[in-house]
């Protein structure tokens, strides 16, 4: 997605092209592209000049959206959504607060921020 976001021409890119430029295995990209298309973060154009495109501007795609498509809901501990097996878990409150802060921070970081030529731009986003 970063490769597509950095393209000034906003033209479709094939997975083979992205694989070569990012040094990632094609089969890995095929799996990721399938999930990103299913979640409507990417679209595909068929044909000779076809390839993949972002469905929204990079400024409108948050890092948390991408991560949750690829990894599932973000959880700091496995028992986050269920009853803890410990009757009196001393750290559950800490993990819940950390989870909220992590989600909020990743929600504010966009794909455009990630590909920005100025990484210092991200520093104000992290409390």
What spans do the regions from the language model cover?
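N-terminal helix-turn-helix DNA-binding core of bacterial DNA-binding proteins
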Residues: 1-25
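Short linear capping/connector segments at secondary-structure termini
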Residues: 14-17, 47-49, 79-86, 119-120
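Residues in the helix-turn-helix
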Residues: 28
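Basic amphipathic alpha-helical segments that dock to polyanions
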Residues: 32-39
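Beta-hairpin "wing" of winged helix-turn-helix
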Residues: 41-54
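Conserved segment of winged-helix/HTH DNA-binding domains
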Residues: 58-81, 99-101
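C-terminal regulatory/oligomerization modules of transcriptional regulators
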Residues: 82-127
């Amino acid at each position: 997605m970063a490769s597509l976001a950095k393209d000034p021409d906003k033209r479709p890119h094939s997975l083979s092209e992205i694989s070569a430029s990012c040094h990632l295995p094609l089969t890995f990209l095929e799996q990721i592209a399938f999930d990103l298309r299913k979640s409507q973060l990417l679209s595909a154009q068929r044909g000779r000049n076809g390839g993949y495109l972002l469905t929204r501007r990079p400024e409108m795609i948050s890092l948390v959206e991408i991560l949750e498509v690829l990894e599932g809901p973000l959880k700091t501990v496995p028992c986050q959504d269920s009853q803890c097996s410990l009757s009196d878990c001393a750290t559950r409150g800490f993990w819940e607060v950390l989870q909220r802060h992590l989600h909020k921070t990743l929600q504010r970081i966009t794909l455009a921020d990630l590909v920005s030529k100025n990484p210092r731009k991200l520093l104000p986003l992290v409390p």
